Structures are given as structure tokens and as C-alpha cells.
Amino acid sequence: MDIKACYQNAQALLEGHFLLSSGFHSNYYLQSAKVLEDPKLAEQLALELAKQIQEAHLNIECVCSPAIGGILAGYELARALGVRFIFTERVDNIMTLRRGFEVKKNEKILVCEDIITTGKSAMECAKVLEEKGAHIVAFGALANRGICKRAHSHLKAQEGACLPSHLPLFALEDFVFDMHKPSSCPLCATSVAIKPGSRGN
């Protein structure tokens, strides 16, 4: 399955000057919501991701996503894996488990995002779950921006990666684009970074 083509066909691979939720600036932005607005395509992508996870023989009892960006991807992945789905969300900028969602002690959970950049949001989600007694077994995403190490990829983890090295990250593709710290972003000389989503929007 050509994941890059899926994003291009959905007009979800944007070019410009963007402020990513990680805080980095980039000339490309992946808008997964445009890809996931097609239920059939969302199902196909989730099945592809589920296949990777099943081949790793992991025991997963639940999928959890940080709102909002990860919810559609996480729900479809949970459906493909045949497990339940929950999500965390920010309240006053603090990641929280609400809406009556509960986790069992030692429940094996995969944290799923639509896009993994540094993995900061995924780790905030994982921390909430671990504090409630859950056991995080893996991370998942439709796409990985190449900072975190993806299972079955030759690319190594880069500076700024937040995901723990002892847990696998399953994703369908690495999208490696230039990313810059705001203090050294060459794009800022000619334009202002815009933020299409998701954190804080």
C-alpha cells in the first residue's frame, strides 16, 4: 500500500510553513484528518497497521489515543485488532482520562496517534495510563515523521525523540521532512508559521 500516495490523493500532504504540535517548524504538514474522512480508506490503513502488530505477536487488550488527532486512527486500529478503544484529552492543558473511561491494573495498551513526530503527546497519554495501573506495550501511528525509531525501518531515532527505545513503534511509513527549531528556522525569514492542528486547536 502506497501511504504517501494516499496522503497526496487526499490532498493531505501540505506544503508551506507550518508550526507542528511538537513545536518544530517544517515546510510540510501531514493532515491525517483528510485521509481519515474516507471510512473505507481509514479501514484499509488500520488493517495494514494491525497486520504489522499481529505479526509481532503482541498481546494487546486496548488501544488508547490522545485527542483529537489520534482518535479516528486509534478507533479504526482497535476495530481491526478486535479490542476496545479509549482516549485521553487535555483539560487545562493537562492530559486526562475522562468520560467514564477506566483501565484495569496491568491492562496491556497500545497508544495510537495519527502522526508521530517526537512522540510527546503519545508519552503524555501513556503516562496517564501508567499512573492508573496500565501496562504500555507499544505505540502505533499511520505515519512517522522520522524522529522516532519505527519498527522495520532502517532509520535511527533522532534528537528530540520522546518514545522509549525498549517499546516498538508501528507505523505504515516514514515521512522525513526538514524540521527546524523556531529559533533557527530559515522559513521564518520570509513567512510566519501557521498551525493547521492539532494540539491547542
Swiss-Prot record:
Summarize where 5-phospho-alpha-D-ribose 1-diphosphate binds, as residue positions: E113, D114, I115, I116, T117, T118, G119, K120, S121
Instruction: Write down the top EC class of this protein.
Output: transferase
Q: Name the needed cofactors.
A: Mg(2+)
Which PROSITE patterns does this entry report, sorted A to Z? PUR_PYR_PR_TRANSFER
Q: Which UniProt keywords apply?
A: Glycosyltransferase, Magnesium, Pyrimidine biosynthesis, Transferase
Concerning Pfam families, the annotation shows: Pribosyltran
**GO terms for MF:** magnesium ion binding; orotate phosphoribosyltransferase activity
Signal peptide feature range: none
| InterPro entries (alphabetical) | OPRT (IPR023031), Orotate_PRibTrfase_bac (IPR006273), PRibTrfase_dom (IPR000836), PRTase-like (IPR029057)
**PANTHER family in the record, alphabetically?**
OROTATE PHOSPHORIBOSYLTRANSFERASE, URIDINE 5'-MONOPHOSPHATE SYNTHASE
Its quaternary organisation is: Homodimer.
Q: What does this chain do?
A: Catalyzes the transfer of a ribosyl phosphate group from 5-phosphoribose 1-diphosphate to orotate, leading to the formation of orotidine monophosphate (OMP).
Q: What is this protein called?
A: Orotate phosphoribosyltransferase
Q: Which organism is it from?
A: Helicobacter pylori (strain HPAG1)
Q: Tell me the classification of the organism that encodes this protein.
A: Bacteria, Pseudomonadati, Campylobacterota, Epsilonproteobacteria, Campylobacterales
